[in-house]
């Protein structure tokens, strides 16, 4: 007996691709929820889902009517307060001259000076209200805080929105960098 014979085959190298599928989520570097800072009806949707936007670009317009009226009213209040300060300043100047000549008492002069201080305080308050009114008017143009892609837009023309809404107007995803999140099993 000798060595038993066996079949011999020469192997050739071949390229084999092994593929596996895994669920994954692709996200941008940062997702920013877009929420209104004032209440009102959406009068214009300026972008489409999936569109690229730039920082500062208007995404939505909220009806500005009431905010324009509030800004006009605040401007009028500032003008009224400025006039009151001017009038009170003239009164104080006149009373100072009369007081120097002993025509009116120190008390009368002090009352006029207090009225001037009060008018100046009302002017400062009116100016603060004007700044707030103009800021709210500006918030009727809902702008993108960054460059990115607009995600789903659940609100449409005519929707009533407010700062307390549960769902954001949309999400802008900064895609300057992309990240893939996958779940890999240990098998």
Enumerate the predicted regions with their spans.
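Structural recognition of beta-strand segments within beta-rich domains
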Residues: 26-28
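Acidic, gly/proline-rich low-complexity N-terminal segments at the extreme N terminus
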Residues: 1-23, 186-187
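Beta-strand/loop subdomains of soluble extracytoplasmic proteins
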Residues: 4-7, 147, 167, 175-178, ...
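Amphipathic alpha-helical coiled-coil/rod segments that serve as protein-protein coupling scaffolds
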Residues: 11, 18-21, 33-164, 177-181
């Amino acid at each position: 007996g000798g060595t038993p014979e066996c079949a011999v085959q020469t192997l050739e190298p071949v390229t084999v691709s092994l593929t596996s599928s895994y669920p994954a989520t692709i996200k941008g570097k940062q997702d920013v929820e877009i929420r209104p800072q004032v209440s009102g009806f959406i009068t214009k949707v300026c972008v489409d889902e999936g569109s690229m936007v730039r920082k500062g670009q208007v995404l939505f317009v909220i009806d500005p009517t009431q905010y324009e009226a509030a800004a006009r009213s605040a401007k009028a209040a500032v003008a009224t307060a400025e006039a009151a300060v001017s009038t009170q300043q003239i009164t104080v100047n006149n009373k100072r001259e009369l007081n120097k000549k002993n025509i009116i008492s120190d008390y009368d002069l002090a009352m006029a000076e207090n009225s001037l201080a009060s008018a100046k305080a009302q002017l400062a308050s009116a100016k603060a209200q004007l700044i707030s009114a103009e800021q709210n008017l500006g918030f009727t143009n809902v702008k993108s805080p960054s460059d990115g892609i607009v995600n789903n837009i659940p609100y449409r023309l005519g929707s009533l929105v407010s700062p307390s809404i549960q769902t954001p107007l949309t999400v802008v995803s900064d895609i300057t960098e992309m990240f893939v999140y996958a779940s890999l099993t240990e098998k």
